[in-house]
């Protein structure tokens, strides 16, 4: 008899201090606001006075961002490539919803959490600069890219250009397709690290043949930090009718770009890296006219 109607009950179950959550998140998003697409996804976040080029010297900005995190008193976290820490606001929200869902799982998950799924997808799409119907939330870059790799209708005579620098999970997925379906893998071996973009592009394009159907590109190579000239390779590939898949695990929310800037057809990333989302979150993007091909 405490609740007059179901809507009152549902409202009480939502994290009670959303305003505090947003205010705390502003410290983290303040750093992200240096990127061009944050304004579209989070219009309430003010633009910082610093530019993306001089923010490294803005002690006040980084002190503000640091205060949003629960840092270890004994360890210095230097590895943000594999997984980044989530800010306190995200951890508190995750703990709240986890406890709430375990009180009555089917009720809370479907009546409450599901209501936020589409707004979240729309915000992520805005951050990535693409229509929401082209993105899907998943668990990480590996799941996103594997969904595409194993879903593409490739035939035994088809060739896929990969690199010796691709992430092991992706390399193994392509090896699986080669063993199961007879897809031919052609390895590019660009001279890395290198500042010669044309040499990197040429290392890929010289592997293109009439049978090449797709080129797999790693946006940032985790071994050495090389930023690959994805757009140049993609343009060269499309000129030959070749599709482009981009592993953006290490670039989303780190480099200042939107997905269309890359000129690719398929793309996947992890959100628990530089976006600092809770562990086990990723994003998959497929160009609208290509979605039907992945099954």
Label each residue range with its predicted role.
Residues 1-16:
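N-terminal secretory signal peptides
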Residues 16, 22-295:
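Pyridoxal 5′-phosphate
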């Amino acid at each position: 008899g405490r609740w007059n109607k179901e809507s009152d009950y549902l409202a009480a179950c939502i994290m009670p201090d959303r305003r505090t959550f947003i205010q705390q998140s502003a410290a983290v998003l303040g750093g992200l606001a240096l990127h061009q697409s944050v304004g579209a996804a989070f219009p309430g976040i003010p633009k910082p006075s610093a530019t993306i080029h001089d923010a490294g010297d803005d002690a006040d900005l980084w002190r503000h961002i640091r205060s949003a995190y629960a840092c270890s008193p004994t360890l210095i976290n230097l590895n943000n490539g594999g997984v980044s820490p989530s800010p306190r606001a995200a951890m508190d929200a995750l703990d709240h919803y986890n406890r709430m869902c375990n009180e009555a799982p089917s009720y809370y998950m479907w009546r409450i959490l599901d209501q936020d799924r589409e707004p979240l997808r729309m915000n992520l799409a805005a951050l990535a600069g693409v229509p929401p119907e082209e993105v899907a939330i998943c668990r990480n870059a590996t799941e996103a890219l594997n969904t595409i790799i194993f879903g593409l209708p490739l035939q035994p005579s088809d060739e896929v250009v990969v690199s010796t620098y691709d992430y092991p999970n992706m390399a193994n997925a392509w090896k699986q397709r080669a063993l199961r379906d007879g897809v031919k893998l052609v390895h590019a071996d660009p001279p890395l690290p290198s500042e010669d973009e044309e040499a990197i592009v040429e290392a890929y394009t010289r592997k293109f043949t009439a049978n090449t159907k797709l080129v797999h590109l790693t946006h940032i190579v985790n071994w050495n930090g090389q930023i690959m000239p994805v757009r140049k390779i993609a343009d060269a590939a499309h000129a030959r009718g070749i599709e482009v898949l981009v592993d953006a695990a290490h670039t989303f929310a780190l480099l200042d770009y939107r997905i269309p800037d890359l000129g690719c057809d398929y793309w996947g990333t992890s959100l628990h890296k530089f976006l600092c989302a809770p562990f086990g979150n990723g994003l998959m993007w497929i160009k609208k006219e290509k979605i039907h091909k992945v099954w």
